[in-house]
Amino acid sequence: MVSLSTIKSLIEKKGANLPENVKSELYEKLKKYNEKYKLTKAEIEAIIDDVVKEYERALVEPGEPVGTVAAQSIGEPSTQMTLNTFHYAGVAEINVTLGLPRIIEIVDARKNPSTPMMTVYLDEEHRYDRAKAEEVARRIEGTTLENLARSTTLDLINFEFIVEIDPERLERSGLTMEKVVKKLESSFKSAEFEVDGYTLIVRPKKADKISDLRRFAEKIKKHRLKGLSGVGKTIVRKEGDEYVIYTEGSNFKQVLKVPGVDPTRTRTNNIHEIAEVLGIEAARNAIIDEIVSTMQEQGLEVDIRHIMLVADMMTLDGIVRPIGRHGVVGEKSSVLARAAFEITVQHLFEAAEKGEVDNLNGVIENVLIGQPVPVGTGMVKLTMKLPLRPQKEKEEV
């Protein structure tokens, strides 16, 4: 059996070019297998050599057009994707955008996803008990008067708005009629509230026209009585041996403060919220994760390095930028590359006005003018001195 110090020195000696994280992972694995199988020094050296060989094989060749390859590798499987919005895997009650629309949403860095949702994991105390998980879900779920109402009526003669509350919904939300009235009274000073059993009568003080009454009724119906803003319904599901909450809508910053929530595992599909709350590195990881899971949902396989390159380009400046004319492509230094993408005439006019010069360093601009592209063998500029041929002396005639 080889000592740990020998393993460490062999890794440092033979795998000098390996990244630090690969070295540490290799050390941990060798340590484990050395204890289990009593490896010899020659076997350990052979393993390290194989790892170095595989690492060098995985490296990008100098001059490889990584951007073009990444675009093709993500673009080609995307043509086989569905264009529909499907139900979230295993949660039929919550709609979530999948397939190509979701990929477009991510790379366009849309501020508001079409179907925002959060996956809320719970702490040790709440994750194994359904009742406790539902208690946390009630704290998160946004409840409005409209959610509790069985029916709503406008009494145009007495200028009143009458709401029939559903007792079951009221109990499920953890509210009482007294709490509902108290919340409404603190928010709407310009109205009187009267309770008769499960009937709530609202009389606005300053509504002179029917249109005022209608407007006021809409405002009261949409008023949030409890829960987080931006979050609609919540679903509690059992996954493995623990309960997980899925939400329709997202409020990532506030959900992490809710007692009972595990902030280390809770996630949202809104990339901008992640960037704001957890920072740009977390947003980069979220972009990679969202694209990979969307592809896998459709049964498509893409090398993660292509997706990592896209995520790196989108988060390079410390903010989440879209790929497109308002982001990565729009900020290219080459006029011809920008013009080739979108709004051609405008780009050319603006460049002419400023007197911009295109140095033809990229792929697109060189393709446009018919020059060899500066990738692969096109990167090499050959310079050689030709031997000067000695001039023959003029023969005298």
UniProtKB/Swiss-Prot annotation:
Keywords: Cytoplasm, DNA-binding, DNA-directed RNA polymerase, Nucleotidyltransferase, Transcription, Transferase. The keyword Cytoplasm applies. Its main location: cytoplasm. GO terms for cellular component: cytoplasm; DNA-directed RNA polymerase complex. Its EC number is 2.7.7.6. InterPro entries: DNA-dir_RpoC_beta_prime (IPR045867), RNA_pol_Rpb1_5 (IPR007081), RPO1C (IPR012757). It catalyses: RNA(n) + a ribonucleoside 5'-triphosphate = RNA(n+1) + diphosphate. Part of the RNA polymerase complex. An artificial construct of the RNAP clamp domain (including part of this protein) contacts transcription elongation factors Spt4 and Spt5. It comes from the Archaea. The gene is rpo1C. DNA-dependent RNA polymerase (RNAP) catalyzes the transcription of DNA into RNA using the four ribonucleoside triphosphates as substrates. Forms part of the jaw domain. GO terms for molecular function: DNA binding; DNA-directed RNA polymerase activity. It is an enzyme of class 2 (transferase). The keyword Nuclease does not apply. This is DNA-directed RNA polymerase subunit Rpo1C. It holds the Pfam family RNA_pol_Rpb1_5. It is found in: Cytoplasm. CDD domains: RNAP_A. The lineage of its organism: Archaea, Methanobacteriati, Methanobacteriota, Thermococci, Thermococcales. Belongs to the RNA polymerase beta' chain family. GO terms for biological process: DNA-templated transcription.
